[in-house]
Amino acid sequence: MRRFFWLVAAALLLAGCAGEKGIVEKEGYQLDTRRQAQAAYPRIKVLVIHYTADDFDSSLATLTDKQVSSHYLVPAVPPRYNGKPRIWQLVPEQELAWHAGISAWRGATRLNDTSIGIELENRGWQKSAGVKYFAPFEPAQIQALIPLAKDIIARYHIKPENVVAHADIAPQRKDDPGPLFPWQQLAQQGIGAWPDAQRVNFYLAGRAPHTPVDTASLLELLARYGYDVKPDMTPREQRRVIMAFQMHFRPTLYNGEADAETQAIAEALLEKYGQD
């Protein structure tokens, strides 16, 4: 009788634990998750914005291939269900996606390990008479992107300066999302970095915006902000870094030339967000 009593009591105790919040039943064992320790560092630190340079169906096929992937794909005009735009999640956030490639930002490399990638359906650019013409982004696509990006930033406490373009982290290889991506609009929504106009004017110090400045001095500022700048860069490679910065923060002119306005923007950003 006593043995029966203890068996019943043990069964009731186990049943209570099984239904208790924070107790997870596994095959052959039970997990108590009610006490959580602080991780050494959060894995996700960077949010990377891309464009697909293709239509939606082709983009979806490419991003579900074995060679390349992204966590999210946002259609140019997202279909709406129950009044909300639909976004495709292709890789769970806790898993790595192959979206960044060879990349570097703020001293870190292998950014696939520490980032979430969002691909935007967009045709990219077409070249005519030696000039690249970038495709605009649909307003509905940007409106769908905003709550997704806000969600990700809030979950992982991503800093504004770590919301970046693919071109920012791989300027020698990539242009996306290009100069028509509305970085300033997103910054007004709390997504990403943007310089204060008054501070840009302060650092411009009365110079004409396109006054040439020393390239090495500008690159030193960009390196402090987070760009991958190496001492043995060719002039073309130097221009690619400057152009990536300009497409993000001065999209009206992104010729890769070192000028006073680009320098002033870099100084204003460093003042506002700190350096690498």
From Swiss-Prot:
Cofactor note: Binds 1 zinc ion per subunit.
Site location (Transition state stabilizer): 174
Family to which the UniProt record says this protein belongs: Belongs to the N-acetylmuramoyl-L-alanine amidase 2 family.
Sequence intervals crossing the membrane: none
Key words, A-Z: Cell outer membrane, Cell wall biogenesis/degradation, Hydrolase, Lipoprotein, Membrane, Metal-binding, Palmitate, Signal, Zinc
Entry's localization field: Cell outer membrane
GO terms of biological process kind: cell wall organization; peptidoglycan catabolic process; peptidoglycan turnover
KW Protein biosynthesis (keyword) present: no
Recorded catalytic activity of this chain's protein: Hydrolyzes the link between N-acetylmuramoyl residues and L-amino acid residues in certain cell-wall glycopeptides
Phylogenetic lineage: Bacteria, Pseudomonadati, Pseudomonadota, Gammaproteobacteria, Enterobacterales
Active-site residues, as the UniProt record annotates them: 119
Lipidation (S-diacylglycerol cysteine): 17
Annotated organism of origin: Escherichia coli (strain K12)
InterPro entries named in the record: Amidase/PGRP_sf, Amidase_domain, NAMLAA_amidase_2, PGBD-like_sf, PGBDSf
Signal peptide, first to last residue: 1-16
N-palmitoyl cysteine: lipidated positions: 17
Pfam families according to UniProt: Amidase_2 (PF01510)
PANTHER family: N-ACETYLMURAMOYL-L-ALANINE AMIDASE AMID
Protein's name in the database: N-acetylmuramoyl-L-alanine amidase AmiD
Residues noted as binding substrate in the record, renumbered to the chain: 51-52
Annotated GO CC locations: cell outer membrane; outer membrane
Residues where Zn(2+) binds: 50, 166, 176
Residue ranges constituting the N-acetylmuramoyl-L-alanine amidase domain according to the UniProt record: 42-179
GO molecular function (one): zinc ion binding
EC number: 3.5.1.28
Listed cofactors: Zn(2+)
